[in-house]
């Protein structure tokens, strides 16, 4: 098992798993010049190269450790939009009701605003969805995992008949 948010580079994660799972792979890697663990990507002065078609922006990568939990629900994680993982919702969600419920919590490093969107593919394709647009404001304080767990709980309480977990294949 790995933590949802671990702070390892891909090479470090590979070395860890190779050792802990006794895989025995002969790993080789090239250290990245100028990399500093205490820095965020924009501080390296290099362009953002999406690690996935669903993470086209650095901001999406910041909220991904929490928002990826939505893949296990029948909530849209924003796939089929230009800002996956920064957007989330479902047709039955009233954005302001959700935002009001979330105001009971304190979330540093993140501003959520009510939003309507229409995914072009994936969950709720071609349907108007109510939800939130997430704006990371301070990456060093942001805990997207905590936010998403609270948001899922709020949605399940506010719309218990509509909210559902995805069934395994």
Which residues make up each language-model segment?
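Conserved functional hotspot residues or short segments at active or partner-binding sites
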Residues: 89-169
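Structured core elements
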Residues: 28-29, 86, 133
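Electropositive phosphate-/nucleotide-binding environments in soluble metabolic enzymes
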Residues: 7, 11, 81, 145
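Alpha-helical scaffold segments in soluble metabolic enzymes
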Residues: 12-16, 86, 101
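Active-site-lining helix/loop region of Rossmann-like oxidoreductase modules
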Residues: 47-96
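Conserved anion/nucleotide-ligand pocket segment
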Residues: 1-65
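Hydrophobic alpha-helical scaffolding
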Residues: 3-7, 88, 141
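Short gly/pro-enriched beta-turn/loop segments at secondary-structure junctions
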Residues: 22, 78-82, 127-129
């Amino acid at each position: 098992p790995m933590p949802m948010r671990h702070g390892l580079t891909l090479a470090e994660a590979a070395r860890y798993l190779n050792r802990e799972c006794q895989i025995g792979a002969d790993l080789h890697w090239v250290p990245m010049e100028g990399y500093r663990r205490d820095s965020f990507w924009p501080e390296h002065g290099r362009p953002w190269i999406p690690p996935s078609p669903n993470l086209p922006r650095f901001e999406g990568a910041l909220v991904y450790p929490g928002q990826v939990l939505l893949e296990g629900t029948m909530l849209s994680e924003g796939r089929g939009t230009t800002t996956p993982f920064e957007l989330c919702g479902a047709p039955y969600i009233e954005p302001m009701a959700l935002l009001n419920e979330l105001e009971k919590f304190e979330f540093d490093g993140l501003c959520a605003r009510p939003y309507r969107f229409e995914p072009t593919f994936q969950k709720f394709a071609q349907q108007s969805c109510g939800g939130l647009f997430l704006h990371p404001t301070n990456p060093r304080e942001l805990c997207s995992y905590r936010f998403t767990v609270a948001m899922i709980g709020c949605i399940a309480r506010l719309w218990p008949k509509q909210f559902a977990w995805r069934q395994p294949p």
